[in-house]
Amino acid sequence: MALNLQDKQAIVAEVNEAAKGALSAVIADSRGVTVDKMTELRKAAREAGVSMRVVRNTLLRRAVEGTEFECLTDTFTGPTLIAFSNEHPGAAARLFKDFAKANDKFEIKGAAFEGKIQDIDFLATLPTYEEAIARLMGTMKEAAAGKLVRTFAALRDKLQEAA
């Protein structure tokens, strides 16, 4: 279906707005993936706070101009599916990586975070805010418990020396 100039401008503006508000972006090729599987992916993306769209490469190049995802322009070849993470930087990467494991024909082309091309595994393994807080609290709790044990051990040793 041919798009007129106004439609193209609207697509570029919409993708540009999504890119400006996004934390990270992931590019993939979905050739060969069934419509049912893509529908499942889109549903999972909505639930994860990820906006996904298939966009023509020329329009996508214009849309990401001047954004931190301009570094991805070399990956805009063939059918391009772009996903922007809006709530957590690793959300789109984690979603695409899990989907690629289950679907051999789904190919991840690249990912960007903070203006640089990143490894998909790096982004997919980033902890969420809640996970990071839990890790921090675990580390703090572990340090406090260790200090308490060492204090009691020192007190025990001191009492044994006095006796």
UniProtKB/Swiss-Prot annotation:
One GO CC term on file: large ribosomal subunit
Q: Which domain of life is it from?
A: Bacteria
Q: Which UniProt keywords apply?
A: Ribonucleoprotein, Ribosomal protein, RNA-binding, rRNA-binding
Q: What GO terms in the biological process aspect are recorded for it?
A: translation
What's a Pfam family in this record? Ribosomal_L10
Question: What GO MF terms are annotated?
Answer: large ribosomal subunit rRNA binding; structural constituent of ribosome
Q: Which family does it belong to?
A: Belongs to the universal ribosomal protein uL10 family.
How does this protein assemble?
Part of the ribosomal stalk of the 50S ribosomal subunit. The N-terminus interacts with L11 and the large rRNA to form the base of the stalk. The C-terminus forms an elongated spine to which L12 dimers bind in a sequential fashion forming a multimeric L10(L12)X complex.
| Main function | Forms part of the ribosomal stalk, playing a central role in the interaction of the ribosome with GTP-bound translation factors.
Which protein, by its recorded name, is this? Large ribosomal subunit protein uL10
Which species does this protein come from?
Answer: Actinobacillus succinogenes (strain ATCC 55618 / DSM 22257 / CCUG 43843 / 130Z)
Query: In the record, what lineage is assigned to the organism producing the protein?
Result: Bacteria, Pseudomonadati, Pseudomonadota, Gammaproteobacteria, Pasteurellales
Q: What gene is this protein translated from?
A: rplJ
